[in-house]
Swiss-Prot record:
Protein name according to UniProt: UDP-N-acetylglucosamine transferase subunit ALG14
Transmembrane domains' residue ranges: 4-24
Subcellular location: Endoplasmic reticulum membrane
Protein's job: Part of the UDP-N-acetylglucosamine transferase complex that operates in the biosynthetic pathway of dolichol-linked oligosaccharides, the glycan precursors employed in protein asparagine (N)-glycosylation. The assembly of dolichol-linked oligosaccharides begins on the cytosolic side of the endoplasmic reticulum membrane and finishes in its lumen. The sequential addition of sugars to dolichol pyrophosphate produces dolichol-linked oligosaccharides containing fourteen sugars, including two GlcNAcs, nine mannoses and three glucoses.
Alphabetical UniProt keywords: Endoplasmic reticulum, Membrane, Transmembrane, Transmembrane helix
């Protein structure tokens, strides 16, 4: 009985410490100005990639290095990323090459996959993603809705919870979402530092979101 009570007390104490740590991480933190910011970009397939690359294309060279994360079977997004970065390098006369990297992770959920089984594939994707995010240690994560962004953002949040590094998470809801959030958006609403919507109807429903009009 004493052992059980001791274990229960230890578990309770650990839970309290984790909650306190999580609360501290989710609070606002001032960002120290720097010459460059390491950027991790999550690109989904199809329209998600087109939107996020339009946004990345408008960013200055100060966001460097740029690390792109895609699903392991997404060859189309890989080609679009390479094309964007090649065009950036050709248009930038101040540098001979552009500093970017492409990484692949397992999909969180395949098309038509059951919700129950997707829980396990998402956990596996998080297990795979955390070492990657820990190695990169980006200053900022930028994503816009694909399921692939969930394990990356959870991993980025864990870096802060563990006291390794505070990573700013910026989520941009897809332009296709006019009145309701995507599933990824509903999850990242609670985890992101900045949640950007592109329609006033969503801004009304989620007052703490940031509305800048159509940005992609």
């Amino acid at each position: 009985m004493v052992c059980v009570l001791t274990l229960a007390a230890s578990a309770g104490g650990l839970a309290v410490l984790l909650i306190v740590r999580l609360w501290a991480v989710l609070r606002s933190h001032p960002v120290t100005p720097r010459q460059s910011l390491g950027l991790l970009i999550v690109a989904g397939s199809g329209g998600h990639t087109a939107e996020i690359l339009r946004l990345v294309g408008s960013l200055s060279g100060a966001y460097s290095p740029r690390h792109y994360v895609i699903a392991e079977s997404d060859e189309m997004s890989a080609k679009k990323i390479h094309s964007l970065e090649l065009a950036r390098a050709q248009n930038d006369s101040t540098t001979e090459h552009t500093e970017y990297y492409l990484h692949r992770i397992p999909r969180s959920r395949e098309v038509r996959q059951s919700w129950l089984s997707s829980v396990f594939t998402t956990l596996y994707s998080i297990w795979f993603s955390f070492p990657l995010v820990h190695r990169i240690k980006p200053d900022l994560v930028l994503c816009n809705g694909p399921g692939t962004c969930v394990p990356i953002c959870v991993s980025a949040l864990l870096l802060g919870i563990l006291g390794i590094k505070k990573v700013i998470i910026v989520y941009v809801e897809s332009i296709c979402r006019v009145e309701t959030l995507s599933l990824s958006g509903k999850i990242l609403w609670h985890l992101s530092d900045y949640f950007i919507v592109q329609w006033p109807t969503l801004k009304e429903k989620y007052p703490k979101s940031v509305y800048l009009g159509r940005i992609v």
